[in-house]
């Protein structure tokens, strides 16, 4: 991988396969992701060449995963009521998401969501679904969450959205 294609977490060799999957998933969903008006979320995005736009999205997911699981694929958080589900893996997804977001088949018995490649594919699908629905990457206003902030609390105002945005922008040299 060239330095330009290297992602933040690629310093650990086992994550390079994660990066390939993430970049492939984003490239496949880019048309949907771009309907979330990433230019509004990160001014200058639209002026980036396509490979840097894909890298921007990858770094956004990597930053989300850092706050959600500290990049630990076997991380499980037991959500308190009323949710009462387990949030699993890099992006802290739940098995209950499968029918809601029309995800690939997930099998709790084989711990599908603890497989980083499955988790990343599903996370990109969830994000692309939400940004298409709301035409925004992430926003929070008076308790109303849109885009990725509907799903990931780290993308909500008062949480880590600014750190996540800044990490993704820095990775592609956006001011």
Residue ranges and their predicted role:
Residues 40-46, 52-73, 123:
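Short, functionally critical alpha-helical segments immediately adjacent to catalytic or ligand/cofactor-binding
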Residues 1-40, 100-175:
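Non-catalytic cell-wall polysaccharide-engagement segments
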Residues 54-62, 88, 141-151:
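Alpha-helical scaffolds flanking conserved acidic
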Residues 51-55, 111-114:
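Short, mixed-charge amphipathic alpha-helical segments
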Residues 54, 80-81:
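Short, flexible, glycine/charge-rich loop motifs used to bind or transfer phosphoryl groups or to couple energy/partner
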Residues 81-105:
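Substrate-binding/active-site groove segments that recognize
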Residues 74-79:
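Short, solvent-exposed loop/turn and secondary-structure capping segments
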